[in-house]
């Protein structure tokens, strides 16, 4: 039986990104209640500009390890991802809808029955990510299939696909009636960015070269910020700048993380959050909203305090539930990781 060694640096990156997701959900919930100053609004915008693209890049980074060695057929691979991603998507969506429906008197935006029925083609709120990720994998599998038959010896497939979907992102994103096509148009490029990062890091044996890549990313991004003020009124430039920011920050996070991995050990708790990120991703919205409601009813309206309590409190609650209940209960763990439980039974 072949065993694989987990990449602790990837777990660390995912752990950092989950914390950004929780912080992003905390700030997003406050935007409708308070007037953000420029600093807080800027923080929220920066978080939302890169944290989900970077998550998708992680999937591309890991996917590239198996490209060219796909022993399964395309339909078998898609079926496996449907079981591993779509099944949790449906189960979590139903549970989340039931919770929101039960608490409809306490929340600002109660859910309707139509939102539950439309899960197959219109995700509920933050669960768009799982829906989009499955479609992104499907496109990647189909692209592999086409290249394997038409251009089996072409060595720049990832570069070509990245450029292709970068163009699609600028020209087609938001123009489709079906939201799934918009997810593909807007985020497939980040998947292939992750594939390219894997390719680059494999070629950069010297860790100082990796650090120089990170420094270069920061310098390029800084020069772009200088130009933004003069060109921000141009919609095309705004889109270009947003995607460029996401790409640069993603490269920076990967480069710095892999550079640091050669000199220090990452915190175990952060690696744990990254390794089992699904429960934290799925649960944090509920607890962020719950803490916000409790603080409001207690008369605590200070925005900074709301942010701190929402972020720290929801992270702590998710961690406690994960340690005490989720990882010890096979049925609950199945909701988040169905394939893992199937393998355990075997």
Task: Tell me what each language-model feature is.
Residues 40-52, 117-132, 172-190, 224-252:
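Interfacial loop-to-helix transition and helix-capping segments at the boundaries
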Residues 120, 143-237:
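Aromatic-enriched alpha-helical transmembrane segments of multi-pass intramembrane proteins
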């Amino acid at each position: 039986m072949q065993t694989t060694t987990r990449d602790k640096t990837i777990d660390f990156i995912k752990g950092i990104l989950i914390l950004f997701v929780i912080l992003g959900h905390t700030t997003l919930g406050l935007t409708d209640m308070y007037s953000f100053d420029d600093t807080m609004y800027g923080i929220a915008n920066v978080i939302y500009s890169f944290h989900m693209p970077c998550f998708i890049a992680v999937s591309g980074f890991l996917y590239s390890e198996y490209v060219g060695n796909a022993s399964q057929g395309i339909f078998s691979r898609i079926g496996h991802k449907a079981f591993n991603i779509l099944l949790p998507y449906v189960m979590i969506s139903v549970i989340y809808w039931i919770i929101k429906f039960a608490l409809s008197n306490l929340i600002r935006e109660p859910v309707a029955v139509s939102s539950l029925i439309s899960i197959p083609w219109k995700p509920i709120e933050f669960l768009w990510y799982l829906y989009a990720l499955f479609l992104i994998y499907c496109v990647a599998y189909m692209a592999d299939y086409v290249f394997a038959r038409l251009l089996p010896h072409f060595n720049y497939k990832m570069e070509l696909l990245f450029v292709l979907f970068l163009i699609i992102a600028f020209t087609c994103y938001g123009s489709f009636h079906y939201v799934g096509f918009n997810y593909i148009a807007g985020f497939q490029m980040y998947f292939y960015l992750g594939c390219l990062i894997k390719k680059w890091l494999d070629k950069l044996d010297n860790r100082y070269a990796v650090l120089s890549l990170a420094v270069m990313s920061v310098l390029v991004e800084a020069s772009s910020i200088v130009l933004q003020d003069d060109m921000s009124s141009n919609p095309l430039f705004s889109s270009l700048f947003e995607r460029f920011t996401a790409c640069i920050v993603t490269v920076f996070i990967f480069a710095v993380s892999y550079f640091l991995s050669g000199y220090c050990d990452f915190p175990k708790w952060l690696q744990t959050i990254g390794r089992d990120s699904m429960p934290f991703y799925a649960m944090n919205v509920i607890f962020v909203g719950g803490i916000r409601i409790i603080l409001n009813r207690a008369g605590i309206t200070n925005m900074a305090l709301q942010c701190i309590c929402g972020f720290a409190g929801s992270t702590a609650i998710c961690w406690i539930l994960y340690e005490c209940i989720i990882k010890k209960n096979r049925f609950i763990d199945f909701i988040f990781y169905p394939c893992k439980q199937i393998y355990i039974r075997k």
